[in-house]
């Protein structure tokens, strides 16, 4: 099975707290992708320390191939029960998806994972195991392309309790929401931000608990090649373009000189597009065989600005609307954030004298800094 697991998470801090009591770890190994969500008891600094310890221990031991029993026993011996409330200092969920599609889900006292396939909720069978005095729910199943797996802390299912809702959002209501949203086939990034924003709305902007959403989406591998500057020596133009055209699903060319070079080598016409609505950026263009052709420095600078606004931990869900803009920068950002699993950059050392002095070294060029 040729797939990639896109993992994204979004957290809301308990109102009045600087630190989140939930912690997410994402681990990539040679054979699998591991997503860990830990929820520390309470909130603030104490909960943050407890969840960080739990998630780090799990992630490190799972990465090294330790058995589940050893991992849970290590956590139990490191973080004992609370002497007052007799509760575990931290709850956790672990999702490991192997590169052949086999999945292993382990849950301890966190809300059950939401598993969605083709817009419907699926419920993998699980077994209960007792390890080091803890009741663990464990599932083994096979994933498919397009599946979503959503891990949440209890702040999600209790969103709005006592405020907008008497008993909170509840697991079933969250499942209904995710089922409807998943039918739109959003990226993991969008789904995580949308669910987090919905929880924040139910809390009326003042979360009564740390609230974390971690989404894993199984997507096909997609290789994106981006060419942003021609070689310093024109003799290398053809070699660069030929390499750029190899083994890629999406091809992006940035810059007028780069576009002319690609069109010349491919012997295809370069056609400017008149369909754009953002006067602050130059219009895009078209070359047969190229997914997107844009202007260079201005467009790339705006692309970075959009990406920073979308991926920052404090970013709002409204920032994702920037990805739908009708301009080259928005299109590049959307491809990188939502369609790209492997990105290759083709950056030649030619300097455009219209942007800066050609006497300056390439390391100081605008594109190199971008």
Indicate residue ranges for each PLM-predicted region:
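Juxtacatalytic helix/coil linker segments
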Residues: 1-37
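Acidic loop->beta-strand submotif enriched in PP2C/PPM serine/threonine phosphatases
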Residues: 17-30, 123-162
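Catalytic core of PPM/PP2C metal-dependent serine/threonine phosphatase domains
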Residues: 20, 50-119, 136, 188-216
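Primarily the active-site beta-strand->alpha-helix module of PP2C/PPM metal-dependent phosphatases
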Residues: 23-76, 150, 162-172
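Short, hydrophobic/aliphatic alpha-helical segments
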Residues: 25-27, 31-38, 141, 193-197, ...
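Conserved beta-strand-loop-short alpha-helix elements that form
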Residues: 30-43, 107, 142-165, 216, ...
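C-terminal catalytic subdomain
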Residues: 158-242, 246, 268-272, 276-356, ...
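Active-site beta-strand/loop microenvironment that shapes enzyme catalytic pockets
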Residues: 240-266
């Amino acid at each position: 099975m040729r797939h990639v697991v896109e993992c994204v998470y979004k957290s809301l801090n308990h109102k009045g707290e600087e630190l989140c009591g939930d912690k997410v770890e994402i681990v990539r190994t040679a054979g699998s992708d591991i997503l860990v969500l830990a929820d520390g008891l309470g909130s603030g600094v104490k909960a943050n320390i407890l969840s960080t310890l739990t998630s780090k221990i799990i992630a490190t031991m799972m990465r090294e191939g330790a058995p589940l029993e050893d991992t849970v026993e290590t956590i139990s011996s490191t973080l004992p029960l609370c002497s007052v409330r007799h509760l575990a200092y931290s709850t956790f969920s672990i999702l490991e998806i192997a590169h052949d599609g086999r999945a292993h889900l382990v849950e301890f006292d966190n809300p059950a994972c939401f598993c969605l396939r083709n817009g419907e909720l699926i419920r993998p069978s699980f077994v209960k195991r007792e390890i080091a005095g803890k009741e663990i729910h464990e599932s083994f199943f096979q994933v498919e392309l397009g599946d979503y797996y959503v891990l949440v802390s209890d702040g999600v299912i209790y969103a709005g309790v006592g405020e907008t809702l008497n008993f909170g959002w509840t697991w079933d209501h969250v499942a209904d929401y995710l089922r409807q949203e998943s039918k739109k086939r959003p990226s993991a990034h969008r789904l995580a931000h949308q669910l987090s924003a919905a929880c924040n709305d139910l809390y009326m902007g003042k979360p009564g608990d740390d609230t974390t959403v971690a989404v894993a989406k199984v997507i096909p591998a997609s290789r994106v090649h981006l060419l942003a500057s021609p070689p310093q020596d024109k003799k290398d133009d053809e070699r660069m373009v030929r390499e750029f055209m190899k083994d890629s699903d999406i091809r992006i060319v940035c810059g007028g000189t780069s576009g002319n070079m690609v069109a010349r080598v491919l012997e295809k016409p370069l056609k400017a597009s008149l369909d754009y609505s953002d006067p602050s950026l130059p219009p895009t263009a078209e070359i047969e065989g190229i997914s997107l052709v844009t202007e260079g420095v201005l467009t790339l600078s705006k692309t970075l600005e959009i990406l920073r606004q979308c991926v920052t931990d404090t970013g709002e869900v409204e920032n994702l609307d920037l990805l739908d803009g009708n301009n080259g920068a928005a299109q590049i950002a959307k491809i990188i954030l939502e369609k790209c699993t492997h990105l290759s950059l083709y950056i030649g050392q030619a300097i455009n004298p219209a942007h800066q002095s050609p006497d300056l070294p390439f390391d100081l060029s605008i594109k190199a800094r971008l």
